[in-house]
A protein has these predicted regions:
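Conserved Rossmann-fold NAD(P)-dependent oxidoreductase catalytic core, especially the SDR/UDP-sugar
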Residues: 1-35
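Active-site loop of short-chain dehydrogenase/reductase
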Residues: 1-7, 56-58, 93-95, 126
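NAD(P)-dependent short-chain dehydrogenase/reductase
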Residues: 18-24, 42, 46-121, 134-150
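Amphipathic alpha-helical segment in the mid-to-C-terminal domain
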Residues: 36, 74, 78, 110, ...
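Non-catalytic, hydrophobic alpha-helical segments
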Residues: 113, 117, 131, 142, ...
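Amphipathic terminal alpha-helices
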Residues: 191-208
Length: 208
């Protein structure tokens, strides 16, 4: 249908370790994925752009940086840290094993990013947009914040384990969302801290 609109979920993993001189990644940053997932996302991204440009279809790419919520699985570091820290607080376990504590990510709340997706589809022109908070935190920052919220010293419980290191690690992801803010008026409502509070409180309710 000529009136149909489609949103394609692209990913910051498409950038790999390609970073602009100012430390950010944006719509014009070269794509250089370092994982099969990132490579597949680049393929989908380019396919959307090709069909939009060749056939005039309303197709949008949302280049989303890491977005979290209480629904996040514990196979991801935010979900894992939130759950295991709460378990430690409740006396259900006494150790948390993690990989690279120095990797940094631009973490935002899924609720904000879903709003961004919706805004893309309301606009009169299809385009590609980076969705991010513009603030990055290391895994160590994440651990320190979550444990401190639970009145715990993370150094008493967290150990690093090489089995959790990735073969080709993404060291730094931080997005520039100037374009979507200017054109669509999008602004994230959650901070890193309020996002993690949401996840901590959810696990406290589930595990108590």
């Amino acid at each position: 249908s000529p009136k149909s609109k489609m949103y394609q979920a692209s990913s910051s993993e498409m950038f790999g370790n390609s970073i602009d001189e100012d430390g950010y990644q944006r719509e014009t940053t070269p794509l250089n994925p370092v994982s099969p997932y990132g490579c597949a996302k680049v393929y989908g991204y380019n396919l959307v752009r090709n069909y939009r440009n060749s056939y005039g279809m309303f197709l949008c790419n949302g280049i989303l940086f890491n977005h979290e919520s209480p629904r996040r699985g514990t196979n991801f570091v935010t979900g894992k840290v939130a759950k295991e820290a709460v378990k430690i607080k409740l006396g259900l376990t006494d150790k948390l094993s993690l990989g690279n504590l120095h990797a940094s990510r631009d973490w935002g709340h899924a609720k904000d990013y879903v709003e961004a997706m919706w805004l893309m589809l309301q606009h009169d022109k299809a385009d590609d947009y980076v969705c991010s908070t513009g603030v990055s935190h290391t895994v160590k920052d994440l651990v320190e914040y979550v444990f401190s919220k639970l009145d715990l010293d993370w150094r008493d419980y967290v150990v690093t384990d090489e089995k959790y290191y990735r073969p080709e690690e993404l060291e730094h992801l931080k997005g520039d969302s100037s374009k979507i803010k200017k054109i669509l008026g999008w602004e994230p409502k959650y901070t890193f801290e309020t996002m993690m509070d949401d996840m901590i409180n959810d696990w406290l309710k589930k595990l108590k």
